[in-house]
Structures are given as C-alpha cells and as structure tokens.
C-alpha cells in the first residue's frame, strides 16, 4: 500500500508480526529538502537538488515556491530549480503550507520581505490550532505588519512589509526552533544586517544547524555566539546558485530503526546519514538497549533485533523527531523509560505527549507525563490490541503506533494512515516488503462503530 493511491485507505490494519528481513531505501529528509527547495527558489539562476523528499512537506514547499515565481523540473533523482529575485515580487501571494509547520514558519520569514501575503490551511484542527505567536511577535519588532487569529496568532495570517526592516529582533524558541530558522531566511534575503537574540533556549539546535548549513552552502554566512543564542546575518551576502544533496529523514529513519529493533529482524537500510539524528544519540540509544547495528560501506547500516529490550532514559532534545518512535519501542522494554526535555514536541502536528498517551492507553500501554516528559512503563509480554487508534494527523504518531500494533495479539486499526505521507509516503509499502503484516482498508462506518 502506498499513499499515492487515488483512493486513500480510511484505516491501516496492523497485525502481529514475528520477523522482518530485507532491505529498505530510506526516504530523504523533509527538513533538508524544504530548506534546499526554498534556498534554491530564492536564488536567481539555476540550482540543483539531488534526492529531494517526496512527502507532503516537500511538495507543499515546492508548490508555494512556485507561487513566488520559481520553477521546478526533474532529471532522474535531481530536481532543477530556476529561482526568483524576491526584490521583484510586488504582488499579493497566498501561501498554503498544508499541515507543515516548518513550511509555514520558513515562508513567514520570507514573507517579512514581501509586500502582501496571506497564509491559509485546510488543516484547521492541526496546523490551524498551533500557535505562531512567537514568530508574529518577532516579525512585528522588525516593522512587519501581521494580522492573526487570537492571542496565539493562529492561521489565517496576513502580512505586509515595506521592506524597511529593523536591524534587531528577539524570539522565543522554547516551543520550536523553526521560528528562528524562518528569521534567518528573512535576514538572508534582506538588504540590511539582522541580529536575532533567542530569549530562552533552542529546543532543537540540530535543526537550526541544518538551516545554517543550508544557507552557507548557498553563500550566506550566519554568525552566532558560543552560547548559540545570538545570531547575525549580514545583509551584503546573496544567494548563489548551488548543488544540494539531501540525506535521510530523521523521523522516518528513527521509525524504521525502532521498528526493526523491536522485533526479530535482519534488515539493511540504504541511504543512512546521521546529521539529523542527534549526532549518534539515536543509534547509541538503540544499541545500548539491545539492538545490534553495524555500519556498512556506501551509507548503509545493518540492523538486527530480537533480543530483550532494556529500559533506558533518553534526552529528547538531542533528536526530537525520534521520540515517538523510540517511545513506541520502549513499550516492550523490561522496566520504565523516561523521555525528557521534550516539552516542544507538544507543539508539533499533534501534542506528541498527551495525544500519544491517549492512544497508548487504548492499547494497554502504561504511561505517565509531565510538562516536558513522557514516561513509558514497558511490558515485554506484549499487549492485547484489538483497538482503533487515532494518528492525530501526525506521521510520527502513526509510525510509532504501527510498531506497537505489530506486537499485539489482535489487529490494531489506525485511522487516516495517509498522513504518514507528511514525511514518508511509502512507509507501509516499505515495511510490508520486509515482512510487516499491514493492510490498507476502507471501512466508512468503522470509526463510528468502534472508536
């Protein structure tokens, strides 16, 4: 089953699976892809991007960059981008980021230099309820006019700019580092130098480094202090046509690693890169808790699971996108695992702590939560299953719930599984190819009957 089917399954049925074996080509990173697409679109001339992700996030960024005036074509695994000079954009633009927070916030940064923009979404119960107050406040300090819904500055959002921006702003990154990344893009396209102060702490510094590295690749040098709290973007720098190569997606990679590490498995993963996986933190966590992982030539790894899983705590700030996947695997550990420093994952496509716990409870997984912690009480003897669970429009939760469902005695139905396509459209096809027992189903009345 793939999410490219014309008729999307209403549910995926996940059934007990004993072993996994085979090979998977890991999907490309949504974080690197969205940034590379935007950078190339903002660069007058021709840039190329190899291995662009095919998920909803990347497609949303591409469609919105086309609204800016950029154009895209494909040559094999390479995307050719003809960029645009935003100084020549003088019309109203309506951006639709879909359900992607990173697309929204990066484009809000760019919109700070556009005369008239509006942001809308059809995902009013997901992205539509997420706060953009930190970004709006930072833009207003730079003399950008912003109108949004309520004190949380929710969508729809309208922005107007005279391009006479201030030289300094500050932003809170407690909920998301994406606000800072958007402001870095604004500084990169502006005529004047821009200083940005982070007033608290950055929840996912690795993602900010991804932004900085992407901009540097195109010739824009972002400076920052030793504390990684003060940032300077020189107005004299300009984007230069570049060649980008995108590595593996961290959330998707973590999901496959956790899945294979939870069952008896012997699986090879192609296209493995660690740049967004906490600089080895995820691999160390998996090996420390019982999974065998060997590095192979050519950016490949071999993963072998089946041993008992040991409970262990994990600092989620090192790899935020990996937390749901690792927590799903921890449900089968002998003992209690605490995932900490993770308040910011409450503000993703879903509340990845409270929403996740609601679904874990349906499956019989014992858990607790604090503001910045998810505590999983493992049970190596598996769970009964036989429940309908909700993925909450969230690819991370859908993949984590799938891992748990493969261990359950009775089938588990996951609602609206196509949202996994946010980062990994072929997730169910890929895990099916290595032996996972999953089937897409269309049951129009099941939700009312069993939810």
Curated annotation (Swiss-Prot):
Monomer. Its EC number is 2.5.1.19. 3-phosphoshikimate binds at residues 30-31, 35, 176-178, 321, 348. This is 3-phosphoshikimate 1-carboxyvinyltransferase. The gene is aroA. GO terms for molecular function: 3-phosphoshikimate 1-carboxyvinyltransferase activity. Catalyzes the transfer of the enolpyruvyl moiety of phosphoenolpyruvate (PEP) to the 5-hydroxyl of shikimate-3-phosphate (S3P) to produce enolpyruvyl shikimate-3-phosphate and inorganic phosphate. Pathway: Metabolic intermediate biosynthesis; chorismate biosynthesis; chorismate from D-erythrose 4-phosphate and phosphoenolpyruvate: step 6/7. Keywords: Amino-acid biosynthesis, Aromatic amino acid biosynthesis, Cytoplasm, Transferase. It is found in: Cytoplasm.
